[in-house]
Amino acid sequence: MKSKLLFALLFISQVIGASNGTIKGILQDSATKEPLAFASVSIKGTTQGVNTDLDGFFTLEVPEGKQTLTFTYVGYTSADKAIVVKANETVEITIDLISESVQLEGVVVQATRSKSREATLLIEQQRSVEMKQHIGSQELSRKGVSDVASAVAKTTGVAKQEGSGTIFVRGLGDRYNSTSLNGLPLASNDPEKKNIDLNIFSTDIVEYIAIDKTYFARNYGDFAGGNIDIMSKNHTGAGFVEVGVSTNMNTNAVKQDHFKTLSDRSFFGFSDTKIPGNALKGYNFKNSTQTDTRSPWGAGLNINTGKSFFFGGESALHLFATASFGNNFKQKEGVTRTAQAQNSFTKDLNLNSFEYSTNTTGMLNAKFDINDANSIKYNLLFVNDSKEKNDEYQGYVRDITLDNSDYTFINRQTYRQDQLMVNQLLGNHKLNNQLDLNWGAAFNNISAQTPDRQQYTLNKLKDSDSYQFSINSRSDNNRYYEDLKENEFAANIAADYKFGKNEENLYNGKLTVGYNFRKKDREFKATQFVFQINREYNNNINPNALDQFFNQANFANGYFDIYTFRGGAGTPNALLPQTYDGELSIHAGFVNVEYRLTDKLSGSLGARFETISQDVTWQTQLDANKTNNKFTKNAFLPSLSLKYEVNDNNNLRFALSKTYTLPQFKERARFIYEDVTEIKVGNPDLYASDDYNADLKWEYFPKTDEVISATVFGKYIKNPINEIVSASSSNDITYANTGDYGYAAGLEIEVRKNLFSFDDALTNKITGGLNASFMKTYQKLDNEKVNRENKYLSTSFTHDNASFTGASDLLLNADISYIKEWANDQKLMATLSYAHFSDKLYSLGTEQSGNLVDKAFGFLDFTFKYDFTKNFGMTFNARNLLDPAIERKQENLTQDVLVQSYKLGQNFSLGFKYTF
């Protein structure tokens, strides 16, 4: 009896088992063919289902017969597919999901990539093993951000230095960060900086920006604060043309009766000023010394277009292009001073500054999908960024202001033009279900010029309207030409191999092996022409009409002579410029293993080995003979990331890594750069720092577009590099490894939440966001170490420890938005945002002088966007509504001394766009 019953049960189980089949497949974006990770796949009308893996694959066992599967993924239109399954057989399928709002009148139209959306980026953040932070074009639009520097400053723990595109990540400045475009490095446009000025990148080119604050083996190791990777826009939808126009104004600028701009400069920001021929034998300078005036109302024009072409069943060509031009006017008035330890001033000047800037950007992206498994993409980016400044200083300067003078007047006219050209070629190849190959190559060229900067220094005589040129030093009156050219080639290649198939036919692990190469060549040259004024003719000078003095007739009559640092017209090779050349090469191999250890615990273990060579050669007024300095470094850089899924909505993350920080070319070349209030000189004895990084993060995702997170982080830096004042008669600013160690520790908090929702059918809600960073930074300052390790400098720090330069103890960003949509395609969005920065160290004090500290301030901005139809919309921005005073103080031992103060003014802009 028992044997019969057992036989019956076995027979029934065989029948039941034989009635099941298997469906295997991949879920992907209909346009980009990118896999959709963690999408839902279920049998319609049941609770039976699975999620796709990291690569969009799924395996689902179903009863035999006709089954309807439902596929859903946030940001995409759900899809149903009927499939006939036979017992004991496997059916393989590929499902393309279409982005929401791109299916019109039954015609399927390709969509733009979903990574521009806030919700999609949050989902990727939630499901990735690595710690990720993104800001997409949707969020940038909501907050009215127009450039990449302002964009990243909206993220947790990131601050932007006022007046520049320099970024501080977790209190660490330019030298500790890195920038890239589509995963490939970018050259710097500033000889003093490691990273490119992110102000020059319009958000028109951006799909999203990734900010990596933890290190991964695929990245270059010159990293401690963060890596900022700009992902350029691609087009994968219906053809379109979008045209936008805008106008802008600065309240300080429009109040000026005469807004002073430089003479003989291009309105569009393109200049071709060269050093004149026979510059020492005659006065042959092209540009006038006198200023012009312009109406201080800015304007902008941009055009975006895209189209896709399909060939057969699998191949497609996707094109996207954008071109834009914009200009801005700024004006500020304030004070700028140089103080001593005894609280007296060596310079005490009032500043009146006029600035006119332009930006021209063009980008072309072409992506060719060869088939579902292979694609190649080409990116071309061109940026021309110009800035002209007319700075007028009036007050006291020690050794220049005479006893018979009321004050000293200094006029500095600076024109700067930067041109960036980026060429990138990238490829993605799915060789089989387990093996992918990805590669990229880039050739970047940057030209940064300061053609014909002019400076004139005069004294206003007492009881008179007359002025005289300062003749304290030849360089008090000069014209300066600077030219930087940098070429960079970079290449990446990496293979991903999935392994460890589980019982659900999904892969638990991924092995990545790759190689990176980077070679950067810089040529920098500078020539300064100084004017030696003849005392006999140095009287009754009109500071507003200096062309009356500086002209060929007066030169011929001996009113002044012209020299370079090498000498005058009779000196051999006097026109040879000061130069420094830099070459950087990096070869790197890396390996990374990502593995799902349990249902809840995943890990990523990486290792990278780099060989670095940096070679700097210079010939300057400090070293008339060509001098070379080279160092090499081998770096082994391990990294570890762990993710524990507490439940579907909560993650715990942990990361450890080791990195390094290189000194920059100009910091190691003995080149002097003179500004009105400071002189900088390089130090060839600089060497690299080593960095150790740790992060612990908790994150909670209440909904797909909401997040609450907290991160504790720590960084230990061995032999940190700082900008310091050397112990010299001229108090030059230079660079040194100032101590044995420094550290940064802090807490980051982020909240993004839907506060109120008034309509279930159409969007009608209030959302809020808050991110804050609380930091403590410390570094040991060691005079003996600096004096021992450096041949060309000595120093005496006022304090034996300090915080990191540029590090605020508190960074805060908050915003609240109201969003409403109507059924007739009308849409309203209004956002009020606030950013606050606490006090931060600007530079270290020496010789009993106090540290220079930038005082706390905050910005309040408002953005209003309204779409009248699906084709026509407007945007209004109001920035810096509170207009606080931007102040810098020198914290001397007896009192704080104000050394800089000004207000930026409020900025307003209004723009309209139409899509055809």
Regions found by a protein language model. Give the residues of each.
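Transmembrane beta-barrel wall of Gram-negative outer-membrane proteins
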Residues: 286-392, 421, 638-640
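Periplasmic N-terminal accessory/gating domains of Gram-negative outer-membrane beta-barrel systems
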Residues: 114-115, 119, 123-168, 183-217, ...
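Outer-membrane beta-barrel signature, preferentially recognizing the C-terminal barrel domain
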Residues: 405-426, 574-587, 660-717, 727-755, ...
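Gram-negative outer-membrane beta-barrel transporters
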Residues: 712-716, 735-840
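Short, acidic, small-residue-rich periplasmic hinge/interaction motif at the N-terminus
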Residues: 28, 32, 40-44, 72-76, ...
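C-terminal beta-signal and adjacent terminal beta-strands/loops
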Residues: 836-843, 865-916
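Short, acidic Ser/Thr/Gly-rich low-complexity loop/linker segments typical of extracellular
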Residues: 47-57
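Surface-exposed extracellular loop regions of Gram-negative outer-membrane beta-barrel proteins
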Residues: 185, 468, 545-567, 613, ...
